[in-house]
Amino acid sequence: DTSQLFPLVKESGFDMVECFATDPLAKCTLEDARAAWGTSIIIWGGVPSVVLEEWYPAEQFESHIRDLFRTIAPGDAFIMGVSDNVMPGAEVWRLERIAELVEQHGYYPIRN
């Protein structure tokens, strides 16, 4: 559970975490990280690779990405990316959909 490391990350003086994995891949959420760090630590990630897989329900994928935009609004201290790796089983249309949503909603400041 990555959330157990939140206080240590903040105390360490790091100003960014990269490859930040969240639910459903890890037992923490982006909301948890924001509550712990605010915008004092830049988060790079937020898109768990499992949401790109064929077996992950398309409706949940769409919901996850839309919720991501709501959580990061207005967009301070966040760089969207796949939090681990794009795996061979990833569906390309899902990456294309993320790109579409970034084009539609990814301008600063992000509005809910």
Predicted features by range, described:
Residues 1-112:
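Active-site loop segments of alpha/beta catalytic cores
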